[in-house]
UniProtKB/Swiss-Prot annotation:
InterPro entries: EF-G-like_DII, EFG_II, EFG_III, EFG_III/V, EFG_IV, EFG_V, EFG_V-like, G_TR_CS
Chain segments annotated as transmembrane: none
Organism annotation: Petrotoga mobilis (strain DSM 10674 / SJ95)
Similarity field: Belongs to the TRAFAC class translation factor GTPase superfamily. Classic translation factor GTPase family. EF-G/EF-2 subfamily.
Keyword Glycoprotein applies: no
Pfam families named in the record: EF-G_D2, EFG_C, EFG_III, EFG_IV, GTP_EFTU
Gene Ontology BP term (one): ribosome disassembly
PROSITE patterns in alphabetical order: G_TR_1, G_TR_2
Keywords: Cytoplasm, Elongation factor, GTP-binding, Nucleotide-binding, Protein biosynthesis
Annotated GTP binding sites: 18-25, 82-86, 136-139
Protein name: Elongation factor G
């Protein structure tokens, strides 16, 4: 077997996650610069960053897709996935976290934890991703390292441990004190490549000694070996302390915190050291679980050994203008050579991988083989989708699936010419394959093509890509809300479908009971067979369930999909000769529609979690405006010692179209907002009446 350049214990698969403006992409850029991966510093404001390579990202200065990039530091290979911080793109974050081993959470040292940081943090908790934190923007007015750390405790319930003390802050920020070695590090040149080690400034010695005490006490709380030395008041060797920090970080017991200013080129090299020292290699992570593809039951653990069977998870698909379809995959075990065949065990299809590439934003490096621990691009797969499992042998094993949220907002799009029509279909196929939170379908009533996604910005960027990348001219309709329907009361009804038209007839007779299920729970539908004594033969029960499921796609009020309903089939009858699956399916559909009409059907609307960050003087106007949009104000908070306030509210999506523009005008462009889906709730009666009267 070929020697691998970087043994698996020297690989780090990490993500960089943060709120939209915490400086995450700049931090990634500096990492690439100091690791020698790129030779010139990139800046987001100038559109010269390496990882923001889509046109829309360069224009908007926000990261939309997770760009995969490799960097090399102190004999280690670091595979970095730069993830978007905007809530409309949480699907990108979700699928990146699924395949990562560790993450750097970047925060703005002036404000600490912001709304989107909470969302991303919870996602990382769900996938048990070990983290280190970087308090960025220490040069910013109002930056306060220890206040920002406190917000991690208060808002995230995290256990952050400061490994450094900043030397100065705001314009006076010069460097950091390393609390493990008790050395002061100063960045003395403009590009931040020269680091001088000096003794700690005299005015900081006492403070740093007390903070080092805090650090040791905090590590002792989570590590028995350090606790023993601590109790005996023995000197704790730095390497032992590092080892304990590493173990506790990998077990997610602590979050080591560092600080710096990526934009001013200070603090990035110690962050890279921390990635190597404290974040896990693929060997440190719990094994990935494989399940039976049919029953969903756990079968075995997949261990990260190169000589095992090949298993990988496709976590992202991209349409590349030069090579066609590119599949990003995380290899969990085994080895694969280019030109090999793989089995897509999710779809039970065999495909050939023609080429293998390591990715560097939109550049690629071709390789002959890939191994356990790699994050890689596969070229040549035509039928593989996001979330599919790939193996080198036929088996019925699949890795844990990726879950994606339902879209909440839609627009109609229509091609301007006949020529555009064919191109639009192709564009939509490619884009929906690339982004599982995007759906497109044809509305049978109107014949319109509908595009659905996670928010206004999400759809705006997709439409921009349709026009720019796929050269399709489209007209776009007004945004629409993805309403749903449900019921409030239990009821019963029967459906009889009898047809006699010469020869064999049709006969199906069903009695159903419906009742509401709790809203916003994981169960959106429950079907229960309560037939006794064979009044309806077993073989017709699936047809009854299908009849109900199909009817649920088209609610009785406004034709929206129905959710949160339990259906029980409890009686009926059949005919020896004339009964068929078709007849029972139709009878079930009739009974269901009838039962729903008697069960007090209601409309449901998506409600969004809205967080507005605004200077205090505009707070009154912002609150009044949110209230006028049927918003419920939940709380306010101050942003660490500044006159900035954050308003937290719940507002129906239907009231938020164009909100960003209104909010900017209310605050003279100084407020920012974060809007993300929260839950569905019942539409008030007067609003329902308005919607019904429009139909």
């Amino acid at each position: 077997m070929k020697e691998r350049l970087y043994p698996i214990e020297k690989i780090r698969n990490i993500g960089i996650v943060a709120h939209i403006d915490a400086g995450k992409t700049t931090t990634t850029e500096r990492i690439l610069f100091y690791t020698g991966t790129k030779h010139k510093l990139g800046n987001v404001d100038e559109g010269t960053t390496e990882t923001d390579w889509m046109e829309q990202e360069k224009e908007r200065g926000i990261t939309i897709t997770s760009a995969a990039t490799s960097a090399f530091w102190k004999d280690h290979r670091i595979n970095i996935i730069d993830t978007p911080g905007h809530v409309d793109f949480t699907v990108e974050v979700e699928r990146s976290l699924r395949v990562l081993d560790g993450a750097i959470a970047v925060f703005d040292a002036q404000v600490g934890v912001e709304p989107q940081s909470e969302t991303v943090w919870r996602q990382a908790d769900r996938y048990r991703v070990p983290r280190i934190a970087f308090m960025n923007k220490m040069d910013k007015i109002g930056a306060n390292f220890f206040n920002a750390i406190q917000t991690m405790k208060d808002k995230l319930g995290a256990n952050p441990i400061a490994l450094q003390v900043p030397i100065g802050s705001e314009a006076e920020f010069e460097g950091v004190v390393d609390l493990l070695t008790m050395e002061a590090l100063y960045w003395t040149d403009e590009n931040g490549q020269i680091i001088e080690k000096r003794s700690i400034p005299s005015n900081l010695i006492d403070f740093c000694e007390s903070k080092r005490e805090d650090l040791i006490a905090a590590v002792a709380e989570v590590d028995e070996n350090i606790m023993e030395l601590y109790i005996e008041e023995e000197e704790i060797p730095v390497d032992k302390l590092k080892e304990a920090i590493r173990t506790s970080t990998i077990q997610s017991k602590i979050v080591p915190v560092l600080c710096g200013s990526a934009f001013k080129n200070k603090g990035v090299q110690p962050l890279l050291d921390a990635v190597i020292d404290y974040l896990p290699s693929p060997l440190d992570m719990p094994p990935v679980k494989a399940f039976d593809g049919t029953t969903g039951e756990f079968v075995k653990d997949i261990l990260p050994f190169e000589d095992g069977d090949f298993f990988a998870l496709a976590f992202k698909i991209m349409a590349d203008p030069f090579i066609g379809k590119l599949t990003f995959a995380r290899v969990y075990s085994g080895t694969l050579n280019k030109g090999s065949y793989v089995v897509n065990t999710t779809k039970n299809k065999t495909e050939r991988v023609s080429r293998l590439v390591f990715l560097h934003a939109d550049k690629r490096e071709e390789v002959d083989y890939i191994r356990a621990g790699d994050i890689v691009g596969l070229i040549g797969l035509k039928d593989t989708s996001t979330g599919d499992t790939l193996s080198d042998k036929e088996c019925n094993l699949v890795l844990e699936k990726l879950e994606f949220p339902e879209p909440v907002i839609s627009v109609s799009i229509e091609p301007e010419t006949k020529d555009d029509e064919a191109k639009l279909g192709k564009a939509l196929n490619a884009l929906t394959e690339e982004d599982p939170s995007l759906r497109s379908y044809v509305d049978h009533d109107t014949g319109e093509t509908i595009l659905s996604g996670m928010g206004e910005l999400h759809l705006e960027i997709i439409i921009d890509r349709i026009k720019r990348e796929y050269k399709v001219n489209v007209k776009v309709g007004q945004p629409r809300v993805a309403y749903k329907e449900t019921i409030k009361l239990p009821s019963e009804a029967e459906g009889k479908y009898i047809r006699q038209t010469g020869g064999r007839g049709q006969y199906g007779h069903v009695k159903l009971r419906v009742e509401p299920l709790p809203l916003n729970s994981e169960k959106e539908f429950e079907f229960v067979d309560k037939i006794v004594g064979g009044v309806i033969p077993r073989e017709y029960i699936p047809a009854i369930e299908n009849g109900v499921k199909e009817s649920m796609q088209d609610g009785v009020l406004l034709g929206y999909p129905m959710v949160a309903i339990r259906v029980e089939v409890f009686d009926g009858s059949y005919h020896e000769v004339d009964s068929s699956e078709m007849a029972f399916k139709i009878a079930a559909s009739m009974a269901f529609k009838d039962a729903i009409k008697k069960a007090k059907p209601v409309l449901l609307e998506p409600v969004m979690k809205v967080d507005v960050t605004t200077p205090e003087e505009y707070m009154g106007d912002i609150i009044a405006d949110l209230s006028s949009r049927r918003g419920r104000i939940e709380s306010f908070e101050n942003v660490g010692g500044t006159n900035t306030r954050v308003v937290h509210a719940q507002v129906p999506l239907s009231e938020l179209f164009g909100y960003a523009t209104i909010m900017r005008s209310l605050s003279q462009g100084r407020a920012t907002s974060s809007i993300q889906f929260s839950h569905y709730e019942e539409v008030p009666e007067q609003v329902t009446q308005k919607l019904l009267s429009r139909e």
